[in-house]
Regions:
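Catalytic-core regions of core metabolic enzymes
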Residues: 1-430
Length: 430
């Protein structure tokens, strides 16, 4: 059972996510092994790397050490690339010498559903938390810090190069899904981090969000996950993202019965009530996408969109041209408009929004925008929004309502909630 705690903050996770020295336990010269691939990926790292394996004297041109205790310096982070049975002893040694973080590749723990394997994972978590050692995994493919060129992962052919402007911090329980999403780099989308949590025996998705919320290199956060041990901790992390003006975009997997069953066998998490998660996401002002392929595109939009020039209230009009915007005003469709304050230039649309971006082809594809009355629309996820909007609105290819900063301004004196996560719009729907 997960012990109640607050999310880990940026300073507590720095040695895990942004280390200066790394030890690779189980380092191997055998091509194709996870340890060999991890060693290759660490070549781009600018800090010190210590291979650890008692069977070898040298690997990849570096002297190999017999144990962690034999290292000349205590590493910030230890990448553990050995079999499951040897992991617990290495974690104990990490804690003993004062290592800051550890990444565990090995699988076969709680995700198997076997009591002894679940207990083994719990012991690792207990050691880590008692000694202040932050652990990613087990059953984790690793961590990427694109900003520093760090790849603690056994995934082959990794792409690390990334721009810095409008960079997204990507958090995924599934390493395979996370690695797939990093292909967005080929399309010019910038990433600051790709963080895989696996079984999350210690560090989980909420902690990753907390870290990215306070990292200046990250401009927006994209989360894809199956379930979490503590919804309260996820909401705490979401509140931190809100407070630091970092839009949080979420795709929740395992929403159907079959998907929930797959989630349990994949990462060891019960997917949980979709209704409960949606309520939590709404309360923290998160942007929820219904399709996996929309996650990165939506996060990229919010990462690149500059804040409004002023704190003017009213309606944001998104149009392909100034003439189109003026036409809407002349026809009396817009009752109150602050379009001048929110004007943006292609290709980076302006005006961050707390929710409500259209990715589909029809009005039924609008995600996050619900019609509260014929005269006004409210940024509020509601089961009846499709029927209320259908036939009344013919939205453009991209529709953004409200402004992320305006939402924060409206709820500055209250915790993120429905009240703070809503913006009144004055658009006639007839």
């Amino acid at each position: 059972m997960d012990t109640p705690r607050h999310v880990y903050r940026h300073a507590e996770l720095l040695r895990l996510f942004d280390p200066r020295t790394i030890a690779l336990v189980g380092a191997s010269p055998n091509p194709g092994s996870a340890a060999y691939l991890a060693m290759l990926n660490l070549r781009s790292f600018g800090g010190m790397v210590y291979p650890v394996n008692a069977r070898h004297e040298q690997i990849d041109g570096k002297p190999c050490y017999r144990s962690l205790s034999a290292l000349p310096h205590v590493p910030d982070c230890v990448v553990i690339a050995v079999g499951r049975e040897a992991v617990e002893g290495i974690i104990e040694e990490c804690a003993e010498i004062g290592v800051g973080g550890a990444v565990i590749f090995a699988a076969g723990y709680a995700e198997t559903g076997k009591p002894d394997r679940t207990e083994q994972q719990a012991r690792i978590a207990s050691i880590a938390r008692q000694r202040g050692l932050r652990v990613a995994g087990p059953n984790c493919v690793g961590l990427l810090n694109h900003a520093s060129g760090l790849a603690m992962s056994f995934t082959p052919s990794l792409v690390l190069a990334s721009g810095t402007a409008g960079a997204i911090g990507l958090v995924s329980q599934s390493g395979g899904v996370g690695n797939g999403l990093t292909q967005a780099l080929h399309r010019g989308i910038a990433l600051s981090h790709t963080l895989s949590t696996g079984n999350s025996c210690d560090v989980d998705c909420a902690d990753c969000i907390s870290y990215l919320a306070e990292d200046p290199r990250c401009k927006a956060i994209a989360l894809v996950f199956e379930g979490v041990a503590s919804t309260a901790r996820l909401m705490e992390a979401g509140a931190l993202a809100w407070a630091n003006d970092k839009p949080l975009v979420i795709f929740k997997m395992g929403r159907a019965a079959l998907g929930a069953e797959a989630a349990l066998s994949h990462s060891g998490f019960v997917a949980g009530s979709n209704v409960a998660y949606m309520a939590a996401f709404e309360r923290i002002g998160a942007i929820v996408v219904d399709r996996y392929e929309a996650l990165i595109e939506t996060a990229a939009f919010f990462a690149k969109a500059p804040p409004p020039k002023t704190q003017a209230s009213g309606v944001a009009v998104v149009s392909a041209s100034g003439g189109g915007r003026g036409s809407r005003g002349r026809r009396g469709r817009v009752e109150r408009c602050a379009a001048a304050a929110h004007e943006s230039r292609n290709p980076q649309p302006g005006g961050r929004a707390a929710t409500g971006i259209r990715n589909g082809q029809e009005s039924a594809g609008l995600d996050g925008l619900a019609a509260r009355q014929p005269e006004t629309a409210r940024l509020h996820r509601n089961s009846s929004w499709r029927s209320r909007l259908r036939g009344r609105v013919r939205p453009p290819r991209l529709f953004v309502a409200g402004g992320f900063r305006q939402v924060r301004q409206a709820g500055r004196n209250v915790a993120p909630s429905r009240q703070a996560g809503s913006v009144e719009l004055g658009i006639r729907m007839d």
